[in-house]
């Protein structure tokens, strides 16, 4: 029931935000970060030798399992 409430609230939060495109003459840039947490029951991780390049940081590690990928920033480890 709690996950249903979160799913129903998420679109209303997105549609209530107003985002405009920055003009070339403006000196400031506005950024918007939206985080979404998905909890999967019975997550079985499998070790992989993959890594992904994160544009805002260094490399990240990937763990896969049940169709989900776990990406972690190595700067924060």
Swiss-Prot record:
Keywords: Late protein, Signal. The keyword Iron does not apply. Gene3D superfamilies: 2.60.240.30. Induction: Expressed in the late phase of the viral replicative cycle. Residues 1-17 form the signal peptide. Pfam families: Pox_T4_N. It comes from the Viruses. InterPro entries: Apoptosis_reg_M-T4, M-T4_sf, Poxvirus_T4p_N. The keyword Signal applies. Belongs to the orthopoxvirus OPG195 family. This is Protein OPG195. It comes from Vaccinia virus (strain Western Reserve) (VACV). The gene is OPG195.
């Amino acid at each position: 029931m709690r996950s249903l409430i979160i799913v129903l609230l998420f679109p209303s939060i997105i549609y209530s935000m107003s985002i405009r495109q920055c003009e070339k003459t403006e000196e400031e840039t506005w950024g918007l970060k939206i985080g979404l947490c998905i909890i999967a029951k019975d997550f079985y991780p499998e070790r992989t030798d993959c890594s992904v390049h994160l544009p805002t940081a260094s490399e990240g590690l990937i763990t896969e399992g049940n169709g989900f990928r776990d990406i972690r920033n190595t700067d924060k480890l």
